[in-house]
Every structure is written in C-alpha cells, then in structure tokens.
C-alpha cells in the first residue's frame, strides 16, 4: 500500500507540473516513456499516446523521466543525401538546392517552410558514398511530409541527371601469389531451360 501510495503521489505531482508548465498538449507529437506518438489525453495521473500503428499507450507520469516534444513552435526537416564518389560535390549540392527552390514554388509546400534550405555540409565519407546533410525549418507537423517529398524529388532528379546513388555491393578479390598473379576462378554456368519445354526425363510429348 505504501509503495502504491508513493507512486500515486509521484504521478500526481509530476502530472501537475507538466500541465502547469504547459510542457505538452493534446495533439502534440512526443517521445516519452519509451513511446513515440501523438498525445490523445492528459490527466494528473497519466498521458495517453497513440503511435503510428494505432496503438494507444497509457503512460503513468511516475515512469516518465524525459519528455521530447517534436511539434513545439517549429521543426527541422533533416535529409541526408548520399551519392557516389565519382560525382562532383558542388554540382550535387547545386542540384539539391534547385530541387528545394522548386518545392518553394508550390504553395501547398511553401506555406510549411519557414526558412530556405540549409546545406549543413559534407558529414560523411562512407564506404561507398559521400553524404551531405540538409535541412528546412518548418511548421511543426510539416517536417515529416517535407522530408518524404524532398527525398522523392531528389531521387527522381538524380535519376534524370544520371547522378549515382550508391547501394551496398561487394567486390570479390581472389588474392595474388608471390608472382603477382591470381588463381583462376571456376564458374559453373547453368543453362536456363525453356519453361515450355518438357522437364528432363519427361517424354510424354515424344
């Protein structure tokens, strides 16, 4: 009973200050108690959060240590653009900026963008790609839509211009002997059978 009373008091005290300080509101998108979703209900004892799969999580305030409000005031749509080492970095950045400008020509998207695209720089020289990080400052709930739309447009534009987007692949290296030559590779080729032909051993049509 004492333990239950202690948890109840903690729920009420924490809930009181969360509501008093307006940390989160109904409809905000938050991360708390190990859950990521939209706030559907707030009480002094708990908060109800619905995730993207429709699951409703009821979280007592006593189990919440940190609250991350992802939709307070503004958001950042952050997109990392990867491309092959053979591509010119400045040219790729120019293409990305042009795509961003075209997005701002569409009123439905432009109204959600608070600041022009920022190029945050080259952040990674990976195993197979060069990565540039970009971001828009957006209205709170527009960040995810803009990220999706920006990625789609970049992919389509890269395809049009022949800019390579690398993907994981492996190069097989057979090694060399002391003479500097490699051992021959034995490759077994299988003949593709005509699907209309009879399987081996089937002489029904003969």
Name these PLM-found stretches.
Residues 4-19:
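Membrane-spanning helices that line or support transport/gating and their immediate boundary helices
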Residues 9, 61-62, 81-83, 184-192:
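Short, structured secondary-structure boundary patches
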Residues 13, 53, 204-205:
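Intrinsically disordered, low-complexity regions of eukaryotic proteins
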Residues 16-114, 124-126, 130:
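Soluble accessory domains appended to multi-pass membrane transport proteins
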Residues 1-4, 87, 97, 106-206:
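Solvent-exposed, non-transmembrane regulatory segments of membrane-associated proteins
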Residues 9, 27, 39, 92, ...:
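Residue-level signature of catalytic and energy-coupling elements of molecular machines
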């Amino acid at each position: 009973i004492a333990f239950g009373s202690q948890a109840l008091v903690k729920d009420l005290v924490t809930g009181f200050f969360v509501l008093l300080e307006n940390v989160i509101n109904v409809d905000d998108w938050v991360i708390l108690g190990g859950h990521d979703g939209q706030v559907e209900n707030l009480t002094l004892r708990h908060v109800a959060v619905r995730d993207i799969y429709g699951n409703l999580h009821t979280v007592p305030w006593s189990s919440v240590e940190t609250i991350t409000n992802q939709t307070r005031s503004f958001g950042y749509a952050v997109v990392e653009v990867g491309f092959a080492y053979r591509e010119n970095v400045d040219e790729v950045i120019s293409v990305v900026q042009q795509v961003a400008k075209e997005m701002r020509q569409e009123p439905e998207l432009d109204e959600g963008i608070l600041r022009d695209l920022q190029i945050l720089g080259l952040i990674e020289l990976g195993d197979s790609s060069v990565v540039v990080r970009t971001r828009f400052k957006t209205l709170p709930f527009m960040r995810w839509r803009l990220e999706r739309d920006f990625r789609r447009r970049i992919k389509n534009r890269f395809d049009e211009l022949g800019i390579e987007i690398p993907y994981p692949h492996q190069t097989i290296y057979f090694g060399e002997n002391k003479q500097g030559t490699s051992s021959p590779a034995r490759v077994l080729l299988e003949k593709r059978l005509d699907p209309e032909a009879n399987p081996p051993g089937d002489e029904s049509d003969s």
